[in-house]
Amino acid sequence: MVSRPCGDIYHYDFIVDNGRDLWRVQVKTGSYMMEGLYQLCVRRRTGGVQVPYTKSEVDFVVAYIFPDDTWYVLPVRELAQRETVSFCPKGSSRQDHFGYFREAWHLLQGPDGLVFG
């Protein structure tokens, strides 16, 4: 089940209930490319300052790369306080640091095997 919090006071966009866990999920969309890699900001603004997401605020950042029609399901612990992450385009021969998380909906899987995505 996916729920949306009421108001804009939380650092996440959705709660995903997989029957065992409640995951706080922040959704980001990107299409900006620099030096052959898609660049995506994974930070929030507070008091006029941009800061990275932390484990106390969100559990996953789900990134949609629009030109490739590709989703990445990123555990926030994998972001290691980064404010920006880079993704290789589909078909690229470059090593993609976050390639394991491409379409990794299984990370949100519940005990009944239900997978979101």
PLM regions: where:
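Mixed-charge (Asp/Glu-Lys/Arg
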Residues: 1-10, 15-117
